[in-house]
Design a protein with these regions (language model features):
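Flexible "cap/lid" subdomain of the alpha/beta-hydrolase fold that forms the substrate-access gate
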Residues: 2-21, 26-33, 61, 68-105, ...
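Structural cue for short, hydrophobic secondary-structure segments
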Residues: 36-39, 62
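Active-site helix-initiating loop/hinge in glycosyltransferases
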Residues: 39, 248, 276-277
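Active-site glycine-rich loops that stabilize anionic/oxyanionic intermediates
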Residues: 39-42, 108
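Alpha/beta-hydrolase active-site loop signature
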Residues: 41, 66-69, 135, 270-273
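Serine-hydrolase catalytic-loop signature spanning alpha/beta hydrolases and amidase-signature enzymes
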Residues: 41-49, 60
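Active-site machinery of serine-nucleophile hydrolases
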Residues: 55-64
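Catalytic histidine-centered segment of alpha/beta-hydrolase-like enzymes
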Residues: 270-282
């Protein structure tokens, strides 16, 4: 019988510019910080199993973005759901917690927010862990993305309805978790039930449509992110679910174009790689972070 004590995870809320930002926190506050930024359509819930694995050595913080999880979700008329604005809220969140430097785990929309944060404050970023989050257009699976690209081209009710009829339904949310996994019986239904319950709140589908549409602006931001990679050469660990139906393996490999020393691991799983590969990813992160930001 193991005597290992599992680190305690705290569930807190912080007021940031009038928004109640929910976050999970664990580990010693005087240790190096690891900031976990979640993807669509999830929340910090996606990190529930990873946080205790890192909190023995690291100060781990995982916020819910506005519009997700337990954080405030003001209407699209009352809040700008652009990635630029979400990055600023995340910036203010870290500053209010007096976090002056951090490694970032970036997945899906978390990458779009985190890379903006890195460009804003390169001096604060100690390392990057990228898991199925894109910084190159080639990363998009063209079949999956057709409806999204059509919406970017023409923000019509017809094109919005295509997204509403599948991507933002329980079937679409469930697909995010099950597509490409080795063993669906290992994936808890809690994932898509919780995510869909959040999306089904009044006004939240409008929020998601706004965030999906505003992802179009990432195309113009890629050059800035790639220049940041080339100039700053941040340590990067890439742990990528190679069976993802949203972002391709090419999207993972392209990071090495700007960051030849990036460490790439292709894992036999889908978009939410932590669901099947949390032990592997946690182990890789520990080894990587111990070597790059916690050398003492």
């Amino acid at each position: 019988m193991s005597n290992t004590i599992t680190p305690t995870v705290f569930y807190r809320t912080l007021n940031v510019e009038g928004l109640e930002i929910f976050y999970r926190e664990a580990g010693p506050r005087d240790a190096p910080t690891v900031l976990l930024l979640h993807g669509f359509p999830s929340s910090s819930h996606m990190f529930r199993n990873l946080i205790p694995m890192l909190a023995d050595k690291y100060h781990v913080v995982a916020p819910d973005f506005p519009g997700y999880g337990e954080s405030s979700a003001p209407s699209v008329n009352d809040f700008d759901y652009s990635y630029e604005r979400l990055a600023i809220v995340t910036e203010k969140f870290t500053e209010k917690l007096n976090i002056s430097s951090y490694a970032m785990y970036l997945s899906d929309i978390g990458a779009s927010i985190g890379f903006r944060l890195a460009v804003m404050h390169p001096e604060r970023v100690t390392a990057l862990i990228v898991q199925n989050g894109e910084a190159h257009f080639e990363a998009f699976d063209k079949e999956f993305s057709k409806g999204l690209f059509d919406y970017w081209e023409d923000r019509s009710e017809k094109n919005a309805q295509v997204l509403l009829d599948w991507l933002l339904t329980i079937e679409g949310t469930k697909w995010h978790y099950l597509h490409g996994v080795r063993d669906p019986s290992r994936i808890s239904p809690d994932n898509w039930v919780i995510d869909q319950a959040n999306q089904d709140r009044p006004g939240n589908k409008d929020i998601q449509l706004s965030i999906l549409y505003n992802a179009k602006r990432n195309l113009d931001a890629y050059a800035d992110w790639q220049e940041y990679f080339r100039k700053q050469q941040p340590p990067m660990l890439i742990t990528w679910g190679k069976n993802d139906g949203i972002f391709t393996v090419e999207g993972a490999e392209l990071y090495k174009r700007e960051l030849p020393n990036a460490e790439l691991y292709l894992l036999d799983t889908g978009h939410f790689a932590l669901e099947e590969e949390v032990d592997r990813i946690g182990s890789l992160m520990h080894e990587f972070l111990d070597r790059t930001i916690n050398k003492n």
